């Protein structure tokens, strides 16, 4: 009898403590009325509005959230619009025939309107660590969230988001913006601030470190000291992230129009090494090697092209970034094996790309294009006969020419600069003039051929048959 009374009292006390903790943890909400913010429905995607109106009509809450709200408040055009609701993914799917559920780690509903996808997420809740939660919530030994499908309230959802500036909620029901974490103030002050304990949040998802840097570069903001402090010592946690996810993140970092500024921040916070270990081995103390100069220049050029609404290709970016590690590797293989430089170059391409893909799962369609651009570099100097015309017809000639021009610029090499000038004139000349340019090449004295020593037999490489 005494035991039963004691258990009853223990349950009552624990319930009261839990309710008290929740009351303390419950954030104070700031409601910003329509006349005090700049968001207008005319700036929101019609499809996002349709999704929110239908959810509201069905009796659910629906809020615009995340980067879309942030960008609208900053007067920028959002790239996409995300919606959050108290409806579960299955309930969302019942409301929209054009909906599919995606994700195991984070269960989401994608409502598709042709090429536009409106992402709908259910309010996330806190992790209590109950046994019954293991099917919906799971952590790795290092604290990383392997599964996060515990649903909760909008107040809990605000606390579960990454940065304060991304935790602002806009309602089409009353046109207000709700702020539970001080996001409006940080937005005005230009501060990137993580919600909650930074080290815990980074361990939950190490990609948040990359996102902090990306937002700082993209928005021209500064990272708050408490948010920045753990990043350098936790940077190696990125090694636990699947390479496919890191590849997608690398494109967001370097091909979104702010690649050069992002690159500088990645290096400052020691985040570049987990993404590109092959490249960081060749960094110099003064940062003025040809490799470092070509990375800076290709990122600046990429940013300019994006801001001018011109196309960019990751294959060209990777071809430029990995060019000098490729040359070093090819030279080393040639010296150690006695292979011709052409054969050593081919093996070096495999080695460099294999190592790159261990960190970033670069798709084969891109590595194939990167190889083409590299191989054409060896052919650009051989222009006699029909070679120049054949090279001009290659689908990757223009990309190869652009890399040649970049090399000439960063190496300050007079011979490369003359070659760039020749190809620049040749590709825009009329056929008769092109023939004249080739005839002039034939009249130039050919370099004296050196007598070659007999080639050593190449040792058998590991892993080859």
Curated annotation (Swiss-Prot):
GO cellular component: cytoplasm; cytosol; plasma membrane
EC numbers on record: 2.7.7.19
Region called Disordered, residue ranges: 429-465
Molecular functions per Gene Ontology: ATP binding; poly(A) RNA polymerase activity; RNA binding
Catalytic activity: RNA(n) + ATP = RNA(n)-3'-adenine ribonucleotide + diphosphate
Propeptide: 1-10
UniProt xrefs under Pfam families: PolyA_pol, PolyA_pol_arg_C, PolyA_pol_RNAbd
Chief place of localization: cytoplasm
Induction (record text): Transcription regulation of pcnB is a complex process that involves several factors such as Sigma-70 (rpoD), Sigma-S (rpoS), ppGpp and DksA.
Any further remark recorded for this protein: Uses the non-canonical initiation codon AUU, which limits pcnB expression.
Role this protein plays: Adds poly(A) tail to the 3' end of many RNAs, which usually targets these RNAs for decay. Plays a significant role in the global control of gene expression, through influencing the rate of transcript degradation, and in the general RNA quality control. Rho-independent transcription terminators may serve as polyadenylation signals. Seems to be involved in plasmid copy number control.
PANTHER family xrefs: POLYNUCLEOTIDE ADENYLYLTRANSFERASE FAMILY PROTEIN
Stated family: Belongs to the tRNA nucleotidyltransferase/poly(A) polymerase family.
Assembly and binders: Monomer. Interacts with CsdA, RhlE and SrmB.
This protein's name: Poly(A) polymerase I
Organism: Escherichia coli (strain K12)
High-level lineage: Bacteria, Pseudomonadati, Pseudomonadota, Gammaproteobacteria, Enterobacterales
């Amino acid at each position: 009898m005494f035991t039963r009374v004691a258990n009853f009292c223990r349950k009552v006390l624990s319930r009261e403590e839990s309710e008290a903790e929740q009351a303390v943890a419950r954030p104070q909400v700031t409601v910003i009325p329509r006349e005090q913010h700049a968001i207008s429905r005319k700036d929101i995607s019609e499809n996002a509005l349709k999704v929110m109106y239908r959810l509201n009509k069905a009796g659910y809450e629906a809020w615009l959230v995340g980067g879309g709200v942030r960008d609208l408040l900053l007067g920028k055009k959002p790239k996409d619009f995300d919606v959050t609701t108290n409806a579960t993914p299955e309930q969302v799917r019942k409301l929209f025939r054009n909906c599919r559920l995606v994700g195991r780690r984070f269960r989401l509903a994608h409502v598709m309107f042709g090429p536009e996808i409106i992402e709908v997420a259910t309010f996330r809740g806190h992790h209590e660590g109950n046994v019954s939660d293991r099917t919906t919530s799971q952590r790795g030994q290092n604290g990383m969230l392997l599964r996060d499908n515990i649903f909760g309230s909008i107040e809990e959802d605000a606390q579960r988001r990454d940065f304060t500036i991304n935790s602002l909620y806009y309602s089409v029901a009353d046109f207000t913006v709700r702020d539970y974490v001080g996001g409006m103030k940080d937005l005005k002050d230009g501060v990137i601030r993580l919600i909650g304990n930074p080290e815990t949040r980074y361990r939950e998802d190490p990609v948040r470190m990359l996102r902090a840097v990306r937002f700082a570069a993209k928005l021209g903001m500064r990272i708050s000291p408490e948010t920045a402090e753990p990043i350098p010592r936790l940077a190696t946690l990125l090694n636990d992230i699947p390479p496919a996810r890191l590849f997608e993140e690398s494109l967001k970092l370097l091909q979104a129009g702010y690649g050069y500024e992002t690159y500088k921040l990645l290096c400052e916070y020691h985040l570049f090494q987990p993404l590109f270990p092959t490249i960081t081995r060749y960094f110099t103390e003064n940062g003025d090697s040809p490799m470092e100069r070509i990375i800076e220049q290709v990122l600046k050029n990429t940013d300019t092209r994006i801001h001018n609404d011109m196309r960019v290709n990751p294959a060209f970016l990777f071809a430029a970034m990995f060019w000098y590690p490729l040359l070093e590797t090819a030279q080393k293989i040639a010296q150690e094996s006695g292979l011709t430089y052409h054969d050593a170059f081919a093996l070096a391409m495999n080695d460099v790309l294999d190592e790159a893909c261990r960190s970033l799962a670069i798709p084969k369609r891109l590595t194939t294009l990167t190889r083409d651009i590299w191989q054409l570099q060896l052919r650009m100097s051989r222009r006699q006969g029909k070679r120049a015309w054949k090279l001009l017809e290659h689908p990757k000639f223009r990309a190869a020419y652009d890399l040649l021009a970049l090399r000439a610029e960063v190496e300050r090499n007079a011979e490369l600069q003359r070659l760039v000038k020749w190809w620049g004139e040749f590709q825009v000349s009329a056929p008769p003039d092109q023939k004249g340019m080739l005839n002039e090449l034939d009249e130039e004295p050919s370099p004296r051929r050196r007598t070659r020593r007999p080639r050593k037999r190449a040792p058998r490489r590991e892993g080859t048959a």
